[in-house]
């Protein structure tokens, strides 16, 4: 009789990331609304790749969304709903917040701390939610990996959205790792094959 040993039970928990998808809400794709990101298609495609990969290999997934009692991100309006194709599964975490950082939700902060403090961040908007979350993760001693091509930023006054987003990625480099979706997937796939997944 052969003994089967689950190598995952011996894995360093801090090396297993949670995929955090931030604000994949209709507000960001509902043109001509104020928070609509015109060139969100590539970011959404890469978010979809990351989500499919995380689900396929069994990584934890967390969805966060902005909720506010205002004309934007109002739960009474359909714009606060998930973008079709990005609805959380019942086995996935869902958190709501009213401030830019994901850590504005205490349950998120607790889940990340208790889950090893390593997460992969993608979604909207880079210049607010993603940047604020990366900075706060650094201050809490958590490890964040930002999928820059699975995120998008809004323009700021006369600064083009693409310039803002490039700057956000450079700033997040100060607080964590910045990579592409395909590079992250390749790295995760290699890690899983080493563990025997």
Where are these regions (language model features)?
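Active-site-adjacent betaalpha module
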Residues: 1-18, 72-197
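A short alpha/beta connector and helix-capping loop motif
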Residues: 15, 33-61
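Short beta-strand segments at enzyme active-site cores
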Residues: 21-22, 59-66, 147
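Short acidic, Gly/Ser-rich segments with clustered Asp/Glu that frequently serve as metal-coordination loops
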Residues: 25-31
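Active-site loop signature of alpha/beta-hydrolase-fold enzymes
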Residues: 27, 69, 153
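Long hydrophobic alpha-helices with heptad-repeat/coiled-coil character
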Residues: 31-32, 41, 50, 54, ...
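Glycine-rich, proline-tolerant flexible connector loops at the mouths of alpha/beta enzymes
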Residues: 35, 68-70
């Amino acid at each position: 009789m052969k003994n089967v040993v689950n190598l995952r039970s011996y894995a360093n928990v801090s090396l297993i990331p949670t995929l955090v998808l931030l604000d994949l809400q209709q507000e960001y794709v509902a043109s001509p609304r104020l928070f609509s990101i015109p060139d969100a298609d590539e970011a959404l495609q890469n978010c979809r790749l990351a989500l499919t990969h995380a689900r396929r290999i069994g990584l934890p997934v967390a969805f966060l969304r902005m909720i506010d009692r205002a004309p934007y991100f109002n739960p009474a309006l359909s714009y606060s709903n998930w973008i079709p194709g990005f609805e959380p599964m019942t086995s996935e975490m869902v958190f709501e917040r009213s401030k830019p950082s994901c850590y504005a939700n205490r349950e998120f902060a607790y889940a990340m701390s208790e889950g090893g403090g390593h997460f992969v961040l993608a979604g909207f908007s880079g210049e607010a939610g993603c940047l604020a979350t990366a900075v706060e993760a650094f201050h809490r001693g958590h490890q964040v990996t930002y999928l820059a091509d699975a995120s998008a930023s809004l323009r700021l006054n006369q600064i083009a959205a693409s310039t803002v987003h490039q700057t956000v990625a450079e700033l997040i480099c100060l607080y964590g790792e910045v990579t592409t979706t395909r590079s992250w997937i390749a790295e995760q796939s290699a890690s899983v094959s080493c563990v025997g997944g």
